From Swiss-Prot:
Record-linked InterPro entries: UPF0231
Organism: Vibrio cholerae serotype O1 (strain ATCC 39315 / El Tor Inaba N16961)
Family: Belongs to the UPF0231 family.
Pfam family, one: UPF0231
Record lineage: Bacteria, Pseudomonadati, Pseudomonadota, Gammaproteobacteria, Vibrionales
Coiled coil location: none
Protein name: UPF0231 protein VC_0605
Domain of life: Bacteria
Amino acid sequence: MEFEFIKNTLLGEYAVRCNMEHQIVGRWLQEEIGQDLAKLKHVLTLIDKAEQSPAQEFLWTGREISLLVQGDEITVQENALAYESEHELETDFALYDSESIAACGREDFVALLTQWQSFIQNQGRF
């Protein structure tokens, strides 16, 4: 997974850009976690638990985007996708799935999170 961290020095805001297949991961990190290091620590703990119990699924539910951890696989998806599959919306109103869901390996995801944590703690400097 390719990503780049950015800090807007005028506004003090942090952002992440991910490759096209993982845009939802970047949105999740910015919108659901942001600069909240306690949330970030909670997610990292959840990933550790999933590694210890690979047959079990662990879910972190955000306001708009959620995270599913199962063993070495991480799935990030918009909550609207779960609603959509339950309620079979018309095709014209269906979300473009490739921008609304992404999967990646545990190692790549943990690397993203730990580098984001360092970026935030060092105020946008590595």
